[in-house]
């Protein structure tokens, strides 16, 4: 069975402000736009509004001001069409609930079924292909609570694949997984991007952002910067976004070079995978994106 052909979606978040009933404004005047065929990182400190932004895109909270549209239609239309798929944090899931891997993946088809939720032959074929694509065919009849952290992540990726959404939202997909699983997830996301999906990834893993993302949104109650990795994921913008939270390590001069090369290495980390910058100014792109360009 071939992969479905998607019409590339366009996500527009226009001047969105979300104020909760207790009066707390979680995000304000947030604006950006993205098109299909893109992997975009959503980066910010805890409490910066990332979760609220995700909820507004998923229609779980209604903006007090502004609007969210997918492919020039209100987000409510996209929800009715089941075109937004969500991969949650593992901490948000009750792993003691007795359910099989294949049943979790089948949940991605619920929006396509009638109220009796009896899967069709097509539903079963799509679920089989989704499980195969994330490499869990041998574990399809296992209880999900028995799986490792990385395997659980892949189950929910398979559910998102089965849903056949054009917009995928992933909340901290690399937390608690090993390097091999992280690389497998990245490879899958890149293949989905190449098929035309729009993928928005909330992550604290700064070091991996320039390696697999095309765009980045930096948020701290509002969108501080948004654009291509090479021009937006800079030391200057990260310092603006994270304030004093990040730790800096700088190497320059004879500690780094045998000659008079004026460039410096700056390592920025929030105690997860660090971002490395090598250049003259705080506006230079990350070292990872420079090496990616040289290898392409």
From Swiss-Prot:
The keyword Transmembrane does not apply. Residues 11-246 form the ABC transporter domain. PROSITE patterns: ABC_TRANSPORTER_1, ABC_TRANSPORTER_2. ATP binds at residues 44-51. SUPFAM superfamilies: P-loop containing nucleoside triphosphate hydrolases. GO terms for cellular component: ATP-binding cassette (ABC) transporter complex. Its main location: membrane. SMART domains: AAA. It comes from the Bacteria. GO terms for biological process: cellular response to iron ion; iron ion transport. Part of an ATP-driven transport system YfeABCD for chelated iron. This is Chelated iron transport system membrane protein YfeB. It comes from Yersinia pestis. The lineage of its organism: Bacteria, Pseudomonadati, Pseudomonadota, Gammaproteobacteria, Enterobacterales.
């Amino acid at each position: 069975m071939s992969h479905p052909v998607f019409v590339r979606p366009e996500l527009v978040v226009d001047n969105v402000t979300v104020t909760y009933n207790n009066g707390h404004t979680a995000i304000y005047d947030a604006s950006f736009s993205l098109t299909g065929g893109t992997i975009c990182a959503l980066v910010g400190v805890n409490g910066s509004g990332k979760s609220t932004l995700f909820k507004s895109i998923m229609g779980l909270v209604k903006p007090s001001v502004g609007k969210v549209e997918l492919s020039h239609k209100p987000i409510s239309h996209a929800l009715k069409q089941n075109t937004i798929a969500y991969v949650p944090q593992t901490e948000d899931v009750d792993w003691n609930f007795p359910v099989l891997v294949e049943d979790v993946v089948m949940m991605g088809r619920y929006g396509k079924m009638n109220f009796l939720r009896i899967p069709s032959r097509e539903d079963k074929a799509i679920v089989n292909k989704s499980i195969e694509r994330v490499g869990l065919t041998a574990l399809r009849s296992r209880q999900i609570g028995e799986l490792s952290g990385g395997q659980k992540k892949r189950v929910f990726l398979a559910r998102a694949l089965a849903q056949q959404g054009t917009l995928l939202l992933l909340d901290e997909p690399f937390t608690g997984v090993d390097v091999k699983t992280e690389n497998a997830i990245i490879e899958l996301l890149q293949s989905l991007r190449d098929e035309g999906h729009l993928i928005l990834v909330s992550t604290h893993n700064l070091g991996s952002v320039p390696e697999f993302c095309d765009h980045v949104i930096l948020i701290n109650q509002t969108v501080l910067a948004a654009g291509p990795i090479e021009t937006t994921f800079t030391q200057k913008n990260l310092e603006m976004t994270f304030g004093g939270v990040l730790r800096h390590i700088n190497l320059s001069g004879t500690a780094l070079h045998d000659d008079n090369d004026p460039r410096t290495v700056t390592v920025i980390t929030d105690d997860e995978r660090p971002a490395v910058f090598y250049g003259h100014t705080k506006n230079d792109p990350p070292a990872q994106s420079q090496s990616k360009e040289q290898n392409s």
